[in-house]
Amino acid sequence: MNATTIIGIAGGSGSGKTSVTNEILHNLEGHSVALIAQDYYYKDQSHLTFEERLKTNYDHPFAFDNDLLIQNLMDLRNGIPVEVPTYDYVNHTRSAETIAFQPKDVIIVEGIFALENKTLRDLMDVKIYVDTDADLRILRRLMRDTKERGRSMESVIEQYLNVVRPMHNQFIEPTKRYADIIIPEGGSNKVAIDIMTTKIQSLINNQQ
């Protein structure tokens, strides 16, 4: 089997990571690509009451089961299919359903803490940080969490001010220094995305 290229895409909540990822996916047509969201790996909280789950800080590195993510990536790189967990954002715990992933030429890992864990970083061939102004990030998060995750506007704003913003400044922003490339303005920066895609395609060709 050909070697697998692993790409990490990090950045604050609402920074445009998904837009950058989609642009890269579009530019890598012709290659087999798997997209794994770090959000799949929020820790199982079924042992906690619902009230206790509501107190969970989802913007802290400890909220993620990085050990499982790392193991899944190692298995995929070794040609072993994996079952990736999913998360129930309404009930705040891991879902019973899993997603089957097959080994691919390229694996993209996308999440706010994709570059925070050293062991995880060491598996990556390319590390990307998406950098976007805070005011735009909060607007995007507000729209996403109210529409897709069943949250009220008030709860999203309160969480941003009390948790998301301080956690971003403490844990996410510093991971920028680990990036091979920093993409300003999210998915709208076509030049940076094209440069990154060229680098990724070169890596893929060298590993085949």
Curated annotation (Swiss-Prot):
Pathway(s) annotated for this protein in UniProt: Pyrimidine metabolism; CTP biosynthesis via salvage pathway; CTP from cytidine: step 1/3; Pyrimidine metabolism; UMP biosynthesis via salvage pathway; UMP from uridine: step 1/1
Main location: cytoplasm
Localization per record: Cytoplasm
Pfam families hit by this protein: PRK (PF00485)
EC number(s) reported in the record: 2.7.1.48
Alphabetic keyword roster: ATP-binding, Cytoplasm, Kinase, Nucleotide-binding, Transferase
Binding site for ATP: G11, G12, S13, G14, S15, G16, K17, T18
Protein name as annotated: Uridine kinase
Organism: Staphylococcus carnosus (strain TM300)
